[in-house]
Regions:
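Negatively charged
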Residues: 58, 62-323
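Extracellular repetitive beta-rich solenoid segments
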Residues: 2, 17-31
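Short Gly/Ser/Thr-biased coil->beta-strand turn/linker motifs
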Residues: 2-4, 24-25, 64, 73
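Short, intrinsically disordered N-terminal pre-domain segments
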Residues: 1-17
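Fibrous stalk/shaft segments of extracellular and virion attachment machinery
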Residues: 5, 46-60
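Beta-propeller blade-edge signature
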Residues: 15-22, 110-115
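Short, surface-exposed terminal/edge motifs of secreted or surface/virion proteins that either
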Residues: 25-47, 66
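Alpha-helix N-cap recognition
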Residues: 7-10, 54, 68
């Protein structure tokens, strides 16, 4: 919880009756109330306080801010706060130097917060939820239209079992590498609404999603992607995967792309062009259950490359379907 509130000069009065760790904070501007761990308190705007409480003085904030061993009843906020998540478990942090806010809301675990307005000029969103222990994230009216970098956004969210990103605007995103890596509890992802037309890097994007049984990537435009290294590495619960819509004409690296997808029995690579791929090492390594690969509309060169990889990876009994 260290650094939970920092670098603010605009203060509000906060009347707390506990001294426990704060896990969730919700500000509702018009109602002039604040919810801390589901408990409602009122607040009012205070004038600038000089000297302001420093970060060091607020370091041990646990529901109240303590200054010189005395409770001062103040927290650092601004009238319209923006909320984002730190790497601490179940911690919500507020930092006005990094993000801007709008007046709409975001719903996290059924709790309504102010909208996250994520600005491309302000460090983007990589690492945003990294290493958190949330089990469910539901976004409502989250503005991601300016974001260009989402790499490692949900990295190592090992408890996350539900994630709805249907409202995400990814039209300006160029980097999604490691975005969902090690989300080991999630079983289903529908990312069909993602606009990936500007993405160039998808390396290890779903690596370590060991519980994933359903993955919808239909409608993806991957025409600018160059790196698909270990993209589905260790997705060992997937039984089928349709990536026939992928435009792979600019991809140069597919090393270990499906490595250890040990439950995978069918794969649709129809329409793929891998003429620029220079590294396919271990592309199907340990995919020993693979029985069918659809390659409708693929050139003979592409088909031969895939067959060569299957052979070098020790995959036998897999049928290539071309019509």
């Amino acid at each position: 919880m260290a650094k939970l509130f920092r670098n603010y000069n605009t203060l509000v009065e906060y009347e707390a009756d506990t001294n426990k760790p704060v896990n969730t904070i919700c500000f509702i501007k018009d109602a002039k109330v604040i919810y801390v761990d589901g408990i409602q308190y009122s607040y009012k705007q205070l004038d600038y306080l000089s000297p302001a409480i420093s970060e060091a003085e607020a370091l041990e904030y646990m529901g109240k801010i303590i200054k010189n061993a005395q409770e001062v009843g103040l927290i650092y906020v601004k009238p319209v706060p923006t909320i984002y998540w730190t790497g601490d478990s179940n911690t919500i942090s507020i930092n006005y130097n990094d993000y801007t806010a709008e007046s709409d809301s975001i719903i996290i675990d059924g709790v309504e917060y102010y909208q996250l307005k994520l600005d491309k000029d302000l460090d983007n969103d990589f690492y945003l939820f990294t290493n958190n222990t949330f089990t469910n994230l539901i976004f409502k009216d989250v503005d991601t239209s300016k974001v260009t970098d989402m790499h490692e956004m949900f990295y190592n969210c090992s408890a996350l079992n539900s994630l709805n990103l249907s409202g995400f605007n990814t039209s300006n995103v160029t980097d999604m590498h490691y975005m969902f890596t090690n989300c080991s509890a999630i079983t289903s992802l529908d990312l069909s609404g993602f606009n990936t037309s500007n993405v160039t890097n998808m390396m290890f994007m779903f690596g370590g999603c060991v519980a994933l049984t359903s993955l919808d990537l239909s409608g993806w435009d991957t025409s600018n992607v160059t790196n698909m290294t270990v993209m589905f590495h260790n997705c060992n619960a997937l039984t089928s995967l349709d990536v026939s819509g992928f435009n792979t004409s600019n991809v140069t690296n597919m090393m270990a792309m499906f490595y250890n997808c040990k439950a995978l029995t069918s794969l649709d690579l129809s329409g793929w062009d891998i003429s620029k791929v220079t590294d396919m090492d271990s592309m199907f390594g340990r995919c020993n259950a693979l029985k069918t690969i659809r390659m409708v509309g693929c050139s003979q060169t592409t088909i031969d490359k895939i067959k060569a990889q299957l052979s070098s990876n020790g995959i036998t009994g897999c049928t290539i379907v071309t019509e």
